Amino acid sequence: QTCALPIGTGGMSDPYIPLEKELGLTRRCLELIDEYGFGLAIQTKSDLILRDLDLLKSIHRKTKCVVQITLTTHDEALCRKLEPHVCTTKRRAEVLDILREEGIPTVCWMTPILPFINDTEENIHGILDYCIHAKTYGILTFGIGVTLRDGDRQYFYRKLDEHFPGMKQKYIQTYGNAYEIPSPSQASLMRLVRKTCAQHGIENNTNRIFAYMNRFEDKLAGEQLSLFDFT
């Protein structure tokens, strides 16, 4: 017996890199996903995804399409420092709003949050407000912090020196060579996230969010299958 299942993309590389405007490879992939009736969970930081709204809606009519958007920095000036090669957080929040209006469910990735830089209540409140307005299904946080592999650490520190003089030394003194870099305010910020999500009906449990995205819905047949049914 064969059946369609959800396809996930965007976890390791953004499917809407600038070159996608010329190549259209992601759009062709979506055309195949739509043609063969697969579900979709796609993650991006780009508003270029709106170019393919027709395909996202077509996929969602047959099964389920979930768009995941990363929001980490509410302040636009800081966003341009931390994420110089993608559209601003405000624009990504507008994408969430448009997707909501078109009936496409969304999930926000509120990660990474950088200690001593954007790990403030003001920043988290701002991102939560965007998610509340867009009626996102869920918010993924993985705690409040960032992870640093050895190869990434050197590049990260160079950027700290460039944009936040003195911050590298603070990271070294606080975290050494640790892989996991939690915010000193992690506990209080996570309480804020959980409380706000509970008040507004937004899912914040990581396992439940991924179970939702992995669960295949055949809207034409009225049946549901999960990836876990085939493991």
Predicted regions and their residues:
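Conserved AdoMet/S-adenosylmethionine-binding subsite of the radical SAM
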Residues: A4-T174, A178-I181
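C-terminal accessory extensions appended to soluble enzyme cores
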Residues: Y157-T231
